[in-house]
């Protein structure tokens, strides 16, 4: 897991956000390295158990996702912290984790193999 501290888009308090960062994995049968997963709509029990330390990362219904996706929420006001602002642009905390400045992203290893469904992100060089 990758974690970073951001300013909440609603209340502006510092809040921790996380994402699944994989050193290695398989996406649609293709081996990938150093990628993140966002827009997670399903996860296995093992990953759900390991997400226990981050209760603000939970399923959230959104208009464009009828069944909801797992997303970060502010620990102070509960506002959703949209994945787009965390993954999609240079300068976002999870845009390029391998090249992030020291101390910006904190990594916590997951135990074993986990399975999830979402959108993978990686930097093309």
Where do the protein language model's features map onto the residues?
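Residues immediately within or flanking Cys/His clusters that coordinate Zn2+
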Residues: 5, 71
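Short cysteine-rich clusters marking metal-coordination/redox-active sites
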Residues: 8-11, 74-77
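Long non-transmembrane domains of secretory-pathway and surface proteins
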Residues: 11-17, 21
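Short, non-ligating residues that shape and space the ligands of small metal-coordination modules
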Residues: 17-18, 80-84
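Short cysteine/histidine-rich metal-coordination sites, predominantly Zn2+-binding motifs
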Residues: 23-34, 87-100
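Short linker/helix segments within small regulatory modules
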Residues: 23-24, 59-69, 89-90
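Short, charged low-complexity linear segments at domain edges
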Residues: 39-60
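Long C-terminal interaction/binding lobes of large macromolecular proteins
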Residues: 99-125
């Amino acid at each position: 897991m990758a974690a970073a501290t951001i300013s909440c888009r609603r209340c502006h308090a510092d809040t921790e956000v996380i994402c699944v960062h994989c050193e290695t994995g398989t996406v649609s049968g293709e081996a990938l390295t150093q990628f993140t997963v966002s827009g997670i709509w399903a996860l296995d029990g093992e990953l759900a158990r390991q997400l226990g330390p981050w209760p603000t990362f939970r399923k959230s219904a959104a208009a464009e996702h009828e069944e909801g996706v797992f997303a970060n929420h502010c620990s102070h006001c509960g506002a959703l912290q949209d994945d787009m602002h965390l993954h999609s642009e240079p300068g976002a905390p999870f845009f390029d984790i391998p090249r992030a400045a020291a101390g910006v992203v904190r990594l916590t290893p997951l135990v074993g193999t986990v399975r999830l469904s979402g959108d993978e992100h990686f930097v093309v060089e």
